Amino acid sequence: MEKIYSVSEFNRMVKSYIDDIDDFQEFFIEGEISNITYYKSGHLYFSIKDSKSQIKCVAFNYKLKRIPEDLKEGDLVKLFGDVGFYEARGDFQVLARYIEKQNALGSLYAKLEKVKEKLTGLGYFNEEHKKDLPKFPKNIGVVTALTGAALQDIIKTTRKRFNSINIYIYPAKVQGIGAEQEIIKGIETLNKIKEIDFIIAGRGGGSIEDLWAFNEEEVAMAFFNSKKPIISAVGHEIDFLLSDLTADKRAATPTQAIELSVPEKESLLEDLKAREIYITKLLKSYVDSMKRELLLRIENYYLKNFPNTVNSLRESIVEKEIQLKEAMESFIEQKRNIFENKIDKISVLNPINTLKRGYTVSQVKNKRIDVLDDIEINDEMMTILKDGKVISVVKEKIYEKNIN
């Protein structure tokens, strides 16, 4: 008969197992400090990591132990302690007894400084390499995690500012193993799409190691080599990442990236109206000035002797005023029609409007379905409608031979 444990029984068994293994007690471990927090209670919580793994650590009453009080993110240390298992939460951690600094800067930061020096020497951070963002973008490319808050912030802010802009999304890992390659591939792929006006690559906030992919030299060079203008939009305020320095523009958050690059539709319309008012006033001022000048000439003795000439000039003034007014009204109406026509064309391309016309989009595992071979029986399928989503399970696939 199978043994079934309660959660408490299982955790108690694990703790007993760990406590009985000598190798889990009184050992040294070397790594880099991360996510460090000093508490007023006298306890110190942090992680220690290398290039592949990390483990949680705690030092209770650290002031009573041989533990430095100035440890910081990135410090390389040697730690002496024991494995601890917190039974109530099932947490596995190292209980630090002694910590010794191995280097003032962690290996990652030391490597980063070398890369910064190298790229600075090559002039890759210079303003002369920065490309300007387009004033009126129609299509934006985004490289970020498909399920992250960053993407939702970008979509929400774009729809609020100019809802007919199209967003091309390249889903990519933004932390962990393989993140660098996916970010680079995303930038390269979006650069090949002619319609895209500029690219945003980034993510929401996190610990420094979560953001570290954007500090890798290869990723920074992908930003620098982008043929299209590119914004580094990583959610952090403390320091500049390497991608911030090689990108054409840096934004502290994905939301700010949209605010920097996408104009507000209402502001554009207000600006157009203000320009219309300004041109109308300018025209009126010019006509009034001409009136005054000609009236002064009329009063001149020489012109008084030629009433026919004066009358002709007066009629010319009235005629020119009418012509100028009609020309200005025609010009303003033409520009307004051009602007409204462009807005209508952009709105037609909006995928949201396609949904409103009754069409749907189906996805399996966050990938769009184009043909039946993209799905399998019992796949969970999400169908996007104009007012929501439907989750269904594929029970049967029916191929239609008469469909081109």
From Swiss-Prot:
Keywords: Cytoplasm, Exonuclease, Hydrolase, Nuclease. It catalyses: Exonucleolytic cleavage in either 5'- to 3'- or 3'- to 5'-direction to yield nucleoside 5'-phosphates. It is an enzyme of class 3 (hydrolase). This is Exodeoxyribonuclease 7 large subunit. GO terms for cellular component: cytoplasm; exodeoxyribonuclease VII complex. Belongs to the XseA family. It is found in: Cytoplasm. The lineage of its organism: Bacteria, Fusobacteriati, Fusobacteriota, Fusobacteriia, Fusobacteriales. Its main location: cytoplasm. It comes from Fusobacterium nucleatum subsp. nucleatum (strain ATCC 25586 / DSM 15643 / BCRC 10681 / CIP 101130 / JCM 8532 / KCTC 2640 / LMG 13131 / VPI 4355). Heterooligomer composed of large and small subunits. Its EC number is 3.1.11.6. GO terms for molecular function: exodeoxyribonuclease VII activity; nucleic acid binding. InterPro entries: Exonuc_VII_L (IPR003753), Exonuc_VII_lsu_C (IPR020579), OB-fold_nuc-bd_dom (IPR025824). Bidirectionally degrades single-stranded DNA into large acid-insoluble oligonucleotides, which are then degraded further into small acid-soluble oligonucleotides. Pfam families: Exonuc_VII_L, tRNA_anti_2. GO terms for biological process: DNA catabolic process.
